[in-house]
UniProtKB/Swiss-Prot annotation:
Organism this protein belongs to: Bacillus mycoides (strain KBAB4) (Bacillus weihenstephanensis)
Gene: rplW
Protein name listed in UniProt: Large ribosomal subunit protein uL23
Presence of keyword Ribosomal protein: yes
InterPro entries for this protein: Nucleotide-bd_a/b_plait_sf, Ribosomal_uL23-like, Ribosomal_uL23/eL15/eS24_sf, Ribosomal_uL23_CS
Family membership noted in the UniProt record: Belongs to the universal ribosomal protein uL23 family.
Length: 96
């Protein structure tokens, strides 16, 4: 099994993700090869919370240009994690 800190890359801090925190839903960028079960186990191992549900979204790379040089941004995978009602909050989002 992979290390949980290799699966969870970073939290996503946006207006929408901050509003979803009231419903105990937290948003993270995750590894593009990870699945829902790995994300659930990683969140429970890192933060010590109980996960109810995991939704995952894939983002395709976008075409970008700098002068005459063309390329693509890297593809992303985002996970929205819903905690159980009796679970504690995730502390990483408290200071934001």
């Amino acid at each position: 099994m992979r290390d949980p800190r290799d699966i969870i890359k970073r939290p996503v801090i946006t207006e929408r993700s901050m509003e979803m925190m009231a419903e105990k839903k937290y948003t993270f960028d995750v590894d593009v090869k990870s699945n829902k079960t790995e994300v659930k186990d990683a969140i429970e191992a890192i933060f010590g919370v109980n996960v109810d549900k995991v939704n995952i979204m894939n983002y395709k790379p976008k075409a970008k240009r700098v002068g005459r040089h063309a390329g693509f941004t890297s593809r992303r995978r985002k996970a929205i994690v819903k905690l159980t009602a009796d679970s504690k909050e995730i502390e990483i989002f408290q200071g934001v």
